[in-house]
Amino acid sequence: MIITQMSQFYMAGLGLLFLINILPGTTGQVESRRQEPGDFVKQDIGGLSPKHAPDIPDDSTDNITIFTRILDRLLDGYDNRLRPGLGDAVTEVKTDIYVTSFGPVSDTDMEYTIDVFFRQTWHDERLKFDGPMKILPLNNLLASKIWTPDTFFHNGKKSVAHNMTTPNKLLRLVDNGTLLYTMRLTIHAECPMHLEDFPMDVHACPLKFGSYAYTTAEVVYSWTLGKNKSVEVAQDGSRLNQYDLLGHVVGTEIIRSSTGEYVVMTTHFHLKRKIGYFVIQTYLPCIMTVILSQVSFWLNRESVPARTVFGVTTVLTMTTLSISARNSLPKVAYATAMDWFMAVCYAFVFSALIEFATVNYFTKRSWAWEGKKVPEALEMKKKTPAVPTKKTSTTFNIVGTTYPINLAKDTEFSAISKGAAPSTSSTPTIIASPKTTCVQDIPTETKTYNSVSKVDKISRIIFPVLFAIFNLVYWATYVNRESAIKGMIRKQ
């Protein structure tokens, strides 16, 4: 019995020794499996480092670890629902804008498109830190974890924040708690237009932004570099085909509503329309149409078909031009400068047609008056007997002697030849030779052409002179107005 117990104790001891020899090898195998290439191991500093540590400098690894701890500490207990300085001071947000592209501008929708880098700077005491770097560049991921201004664009119809290939946002944190937040935006903003001077018009397209929820007692806005340098437009930033960007004016406004007073930052971009397109498409065709309508004054007044074609064609052409010129404009209730020009041109063209109608009317009346004499003369011819001879003699015979006579000069003989009746007396004073015949003026139904109408003669001078005077006054007025507007913008 004792021997059996000793043998069992001996076997248990051998088994224990065997297990002691096996376990260290097993532990080494497990650790070797964990340290495969590409795996990470814990370091004493508490960070993560690759197995191939010489590839990454130790100081860089230390900075990453340090700032990771700093950010974790800053965000620990940070409430992004509360603005900086809540209950103590007003939060000041400084802004500036860099315009990368401006345009296009839509006249029909009265809006414009602008692509900008929008920058905002503010101070947050909760984000102060001490570290090896004074400025910490960050990406957009931290922006969702901290408080940011609730800026919106008052006259923006649609705004797009670019997200390709990642959200185009930049966040920089300074050790004193100052933050710089930059984003790239494409904004479709409203631009009220007054088109009375179209197409020599100038517009001030505003860009207005401010806080949506915070009043002036909580958040105020200011320009980072002052009013002169806080808004900058790139040299090649204009995307305008019909406008020139003259400049911009920066300002600040206070608006009042039922919820309080709000600060609104404003920038007005001044645009001047290019007139070249409209000169080619509208003004020159109108001028040429008016000149063409005045060509009819130099045609014969009996050329009814030609002058009718001139008048009707030019009127229809002006109607077509006026309709096409309005297609590129919004349907405003007032007349523009182009409308006035086309209305005057239309009046000249229509007046030329009326002038022809007047001349043609009086021309037909004169033919009718001449035609009245023909039936009366034919009636007289039937009642008065005439000598059946075809030739009228230009001589007369007195006592056997023949003398030549000029009936056109001698009025007495002309009266005798026209008014004397055949006498039955046996002793006539004047004995006509066999060649003598009775002279009778009988009108014929022949159409005679009228001379140039006095109305046409006057119109050839009056119409061109009046049209030239109108053009001088029209262009002088709007060119001077354009210079005054440009001078006003430079002063601002």
From Swiss-Prot:
It is found in: Postsynaptic cell membrane; Cell membrane. The chain crosses the membrane at residues 275-295, 306-325, 337-357, 458-478. Keywords: Cell membrane, Chloride, Chloride channel, Disulfide bond, Glycoprotein, Ion channel, Ion transport, Ligand-gated ion channel, Membrane, Phosphoprotein, Postsynaptic cell membrane, Receptor, Signal, Synapse, Transmembrane, Transmembrane helix, Transport. Gene3D superfamilies: Neurotransmitter-gated ion-channel ligand-binding domain (2.70.170.10), Neurotransmitter-gated ion-channel transmembrane domain (1.20.58.390). Residues 296-305, 358-457 are cytoplasmic. The modification Phosphoserine is found at residues 426, 433. It is a multi-pass membrane protein. InterPro entries: GABAA/Glycine_rcpt, GABAAa_rcpt, GABBAa3_rcpt, Gabra-1-6_TM, Neur_chan_lig-bd, Neur_chan_lig-bd_sf, Neur_channel, Neuro-gated_channel_TM_sf. It catalyses: chloride(in) = chloride(out). 4-aminobutanoate binds at residues 119, 182. Glycans are attached at residues 63, 163, 176, 228. One of its GO terms (biological process) is chloride transmembrane transport. Residues 1-28 form the signal peptide. The modification Phosphothreonine is found at residue 427. Disulfide bonds join 191-205. Alpha subunit of the heteropentameric ligand-gated chloride channel gated by gamma-aminobutyric acid (GABA), a major inhibitory neurotransmitter in the brain. GABA-gated chloride channels, also named GABA(A) receptors (GABAAR), consist of five subunits arranged around a central pore and contain GABA active binding site(s) located at the alpha and beta subunit interface(s). When activated by GABA, GABAARs selectively allow the flow of chloride anions across the cell membrane down their electrochemical gradient. Belongs to the ligand-gated ion channel (TC 1.A.9) family. Gamma-aminobutyric acid receptor (TC 1.A.9.5) subfamily. GABRA3 sub-subfamily. PANTHER family: NEUROTRANSMITTER GATED ION CHANNEL. GABAARs subunits share a common topological structure: a peptide sequence made up of a long extracellular N-terminal, four transmembrane domains, intracellular or cytoplasmic domain located between the third and the fourth transmembrane domains. This is Gamma-aminobutyric acid receptor subunit alpha-3. The lineage of its organism: Eukaryota, Metazoa, Chordata, Craniata, Vertebrata.
